[in-house]
């Protein structure tokens, strides 16, 4: 019987406060997250941003216990998925590849080679595909695989996105239903989907399918929820976690919360639709920041649906996903990592420079100006930032 390796790809997160700076550096070193006009500037810019953001981010992690639980939860998901697959007769072993913190993709590849895996199934723990999440992880895996003659020979099948998978939808409905049942008037409870945002240019200029998949997913969940409950609840979709000067997908979560408060919504069921495990965006951003905004807006009952974590229906769904990937049409790593044909952002292989209206280009220009100003002041020891007391 073939030895199957199931590779679960995720973001990763700092486990201790001292990890926050290096984690942010890794994050912003990824050109799929922030893009500069010349690759030589990528790492200096990542250092600048991670240095400026480190203190604020450390405070956020301190508010949830001093570190991210994402590795612990992902390891629990991997163990339970492995057990479920073996119960179904597969000789499967699960591995974890984090994009920006330990255990990195290189570590997972080394473990699979050492274990003599015969074929690999790759599952990104992002239900919805985006250039900056699954896309970045697939491209990193492809780069490492292409450079490894031994690992390159191992057959590999990939799942690009899985937001419409029945087990995922069913588990979301079960968790949402639990919170709705706590409301005095369940049919009046407002379901508030909040998804991690991406820059608007990723969708409009680069053809990222993320926004469409999020919208389709929220409607699928609402339809399944109606079948389960026998009524349709009012619902809204918004996007959170935006950073930087460029425009991100709208509507923004904090603005919608204020609008719902003005509309006299009393029972709010907050659904973190793009997160399969608890981490900083659920535990701090939603549970602390957005809850405070909602309460100030007059929303009386703020109920947040738990992330999927190791919910039994979700783990069952993941096992079905692995089996269907093995039995269905093959999607190889080349296809999974391929960006949409429409791409206008600068691909990693073709760094260009030009005067056009791309917000990503302007983001790069502004970032370069900030970096040069900071660099000059650090060298000279004087300038406007020193006068303002920033340096």
Swiss-Prot record:
Keywords, ordered alphabetically: Cytoplasm, Heme biosynthesis, Iron, Lyase, Metal-binding, Porphyrin biosynthesis
Classification via InterPro entries: Ferrochelatase (IPR001015), Ferrochelatase_AS (IPR019772), Ferrochelatase_C (IPR033644), Ferrochelatase_N (IPR033659)
Residues reported in the UniProt entry to bind Fe cation: 196, 281
Main location: cytoplasm
Catalytic activity, reaction form: heme b + 2 H(+) = protoporphyrin IX + Fe(2+)
GO cellular component, one term: cytoplasm
CDD domains: Ferrochelatase_C, Ferrochelatase_N
GO function term, MF aspect, one: ferrochelatase activity
PROSITE patterns with a match to the protein in the record: FERROCHELATASE
Cellular localization per UniProt: Cytoplasm
EC number: 4.98.1.1
Top EC class of this enzyme: lyase
UniProt record similarity statement: Belongs to the ferrochelatase family.
Annotated function: Catalyzes the ferrous insertion into protoporphyrin IX.
Annotated HAMAP family: Ferrochelatase
This protein's name: Ferrochelatase
Native species: Prochlorococcus marinus (strain AS9601)
């Amino acid at each position: 019987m073939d030895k199957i390796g199931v590779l679960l790809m995720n973001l990763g997160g700092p486990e201790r406060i001292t990890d926050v700076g290096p984690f942010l550096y890794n994050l912003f070193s990824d050109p799929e997250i922030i893009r500069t006009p010349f690759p030589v500037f990528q790492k200096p810019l990542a250092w600048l941003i991670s240095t400026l953001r480190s203190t604020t981010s450390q405070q956020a992690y301190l508010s949830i216990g001093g570190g991210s639980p994402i590795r612990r939860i992902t390891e629990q998901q991997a163990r339970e998925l492995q057990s479920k697959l073996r119960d179904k007769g597969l000789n499967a072993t699960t591995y974890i590849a984090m994009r920006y913190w330990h255990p990195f993709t290189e570590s997972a590849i080394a473990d699979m080679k050492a274990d003599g895996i015969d074929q690999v199934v790759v599952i990104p723990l992002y239900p919805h595909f985006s250039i900056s999440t699954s896309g970045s992880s697939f491209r990193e895996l492809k780069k490492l695989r292409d450079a490894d003659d031994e690992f390159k020979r191992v057959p590999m099948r990939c799942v690009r996105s899985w937001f419409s998978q029945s087990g995922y939808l069913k588990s979301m409905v079960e968790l949402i239903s639990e919170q709705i049942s706590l409301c005095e008037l369940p049919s009046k409870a407002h379901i508030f989907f909040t998804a991690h945002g991406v820059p608007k240019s990723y969708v409009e200029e680069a053809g990222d399918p993320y926004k469409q998949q999020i919208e389709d997913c929220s409607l699928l969940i609402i339809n399944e929820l109606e079948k389960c409950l026998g009524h349709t609840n009012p619902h809204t979709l918004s996007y959170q976690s935006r950073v930087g000067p460029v425009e991100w997908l709208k509507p923004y979560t904090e603005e919608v919360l204020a609008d719902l408060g003005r509309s006299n919504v009393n029972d709010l069921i907050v659904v973190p639709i793009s997160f399969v495990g608890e981490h900083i965006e659920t535990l701090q951003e939603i549970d602390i920041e957005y809850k405070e905004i909602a309460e100030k807006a007059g929303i009386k009952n703020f109920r947040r649906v738990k992330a999927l974590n190791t919910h039994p229906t979700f783990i069952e769904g993941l096992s079905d996903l692995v089996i269907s990937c093995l039995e269905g049409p093959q999607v190889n790593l080349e296809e999974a990592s391929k960006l949409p044909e429409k791409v206008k952002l600068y691909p990693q292989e073709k760094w260009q420079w030009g005067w056009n209206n791309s917000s990503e280009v302007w983001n790069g220009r502004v970032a370069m100006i900030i970096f040069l100003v900071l660099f000059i002041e650090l060298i000279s020891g004087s300038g406007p930032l020193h006068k303002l007391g920033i340096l």
